[in-house]
From Swiss-Prot:
Region called Disordered, residue ranges: 1-26, 47-97
Record-linked Pfam families: FKBP_C, TPR_1
Family membership noted in the UniProt record: Belongs to the FKBP-type PPIase family.
GO MF entries: peptidyl-prolyl cis-trans isomerase activity
Protein name listed in UniProt: FK506-binding protein 6
Job of this protein: PPIases accelerate the folding of proteins by catalyzing the cis-trans isomerization of proline imidic peptide bonds in oligopeptides.
Residue stretches making up the PPIase FKBP-type domain: 123-211
Reactions this protein catalyses: [protein]-peptidylproline (omega=180) = [protein]-peptidylproline (omega=0)
Ranges of Low complexity composition bias in the record: 11-26, 47-92
Assigned EC number: 5.2.1.8
Keyword Methyltransferase annotated: no
Designated gene of the protein: fkbp6
Amino acid sequence: MNLSLPLNKDNSGNSGNSGNSGGSVCSSNNTLSPILSNSILSSPISSPRLISSSNNNNNNNNNNNNNNNNNNNNNNNNTINSDSNNNNNINNKPRKAGIQLDSDGCLIKRIIKEGYGEIPPPRSIVTVHYEGYLSNQVLFDSSVQRNSPFTFQMGTKSVIDAIELSISTMKVGQEAEIVTTQRYAFGKLGLPPFIPPNVSVIYKIKLLSYKLKSNDFTNFESLINKSKEEKEIGNQFFQKSNYKKSIRHYVKSIWILNDPEQTLGLNEMENKLLKDTLIILYLNLASCNIKLKDGKRGISNCEKILELGGNTTAKFYYRMGQAYSLNKQYDSAKRCLVQAIRLEPNDKLLRDELENIKKLQEENNK
């Protein structure tokens, strides 16, 4: 399995998040990307390997190699490393009571060993050792056994939410045990045949180091161009009626433009171009939401356009009216269509949509 993993997705195709989207507490329809290595997946999983004392001995034999890696990392001034005198083994017994990392108790962190310094800033590049267990203590993945620390960039949706959320609270050198339901792990579907459906998992994690991310874009023009590339891919999927994939690329395009590190200090012309580009992207997202009959998200994306303070067009009011109609907010939908017709009085499509909304409201009131 390639460790270059896709964005988390929910059933609507929108970028996943950790919030409760309805249904039972601690449940989710998300099928999230795991941390699983090629070496683990290349061998049969019918007899999963268990952590044993021999594994711990192997880990101890590899301490010198890990410490050498830490010493090399210290040459980078922007890299924060754990003490090279400490080995990279992960202790097995939590020393403190659990800390609830979410509002529903679906993600619990227990500190095994304290770290030092500051927690990683957003979008840092972090290096960790980890062990992943099913709830019956079966080990399904271990960077420790491979003597191969795992590195990824935070904020890129490249790991399951449980890993991302936990590491965002850890200091360098800290070791922790993470207990999570499927909501922040592999979702209701699991990852057959390696991870069963709808299971809780346990991770033991040690934060070895982090370094600040260097700028991806040297200037505003390259930032806009990268965003446009994602938007064009989204447009292509839209033309093919693949609205979920289209949403994915529109969201990524917005994510690029919403990075405060990249957009700080823009001049007036650049800020206008940034705002206009975001308005188009949110309008495209709303169109996808409407195609997928998701009025609630359609309204939300239209409201983001209002927050940006852009000039509202007939097309905007048309989309927002459609979204309100899907959400059965017919009075709001009619007001939007009336405003759209004021801006484009000769557009038959707008008048037809207004009549359609009136009919839907009448049927709903029967």
